[in-house]
Design a protein with these regions (language model features):
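Short, surface-exposed beta-strand/loop "edge" segments at domain boundaries and coil↔beta transitions
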Residues: 14-20, 49-54, 77
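Polar/acidic, low-complexity leader/linker segments enriched in S/T/G and N/D
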Residues: 1-37
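Structured helix-beta-strand junction loops
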Residues: 36-39, 88
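Short, structured beta-strand-loop surface elements
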Residues: 44-64
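Short conserved beta-strand and strand-loop elements enriched in small hydrophobics
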Residues: 39-48, 94
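Short, flexible beta-strand-to-coil junctions
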Residues: 12-16, 46-49, 99-102
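Residue microenvironments linked to proteolytic maturation
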Residues: 4-8, 58-137
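Flexible, active-site-adjacent loop/turn segments at secondary-structure boundaries
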Residues: 12, 27, 31, 51, ...
């Protein structure tokens, strides 16, 4: 067992409706990522900012959505717990924490055109069901 668990996946999928009736437009994260980079975005468990669980090494927008790659660190009790749950298949969701900068209504939907990305969490139930992670090492 290593001191870290490498994971990757999509934290957001463009033009895909989530369970809160939000849709994220392509490019919505570009300004935020240009300002903060991956290092400015925290890795949390269930959006709990009291105990970060790792670091995001890469966060990029591609044609599909917001791709993330990072390491869950076993140096903390919460990191060890989350890594074990991810390896067992009990946790595989990703969820974003953000501040809306620019959005528009489209019927019942809120289209997020520009957001300030604060964190990406490993979660049990993602608001966007397709936002999932995989273990890569």
């Amino acid at each position: 067992m290593t001191d870290e668990l490498k994971i990757e996946g999509y934290a957001s999928l463009f033009w895909t409706r989530d369970l809160n009736d939000d849709v994220t437009a392509a490019g919505a994260f570009s300004d935020s990522l240009a300002t903060s980079g991956a290092g400015g975005v925290k890795m949390l468990h269930q959006h709990d900012d009291a105990e970060p669980i790792g670091v995001w090494d890469e966060i990029v927008e591609d044609a599909r959505g917001l791709f993330v790659r990072g390491r869950i660190l076993r140096a903390t009790p919460r990191g060890r717990l989350v890594a074990a749950l991810v390896e067992a298949g009990a946790l595989d969701g990703l969820s974003i924490g953000f501040r809306q900068v620019k959005a528009r209504a489209d019927g019942a939907l809120r289209v997020l055109k520009r957001v300030e990305l604060w964190e990406v969490s490993v979660v049990t139930f993602p608001m966007l069901p397709g936002a999932r992670l995989t273990v890569v090492g």
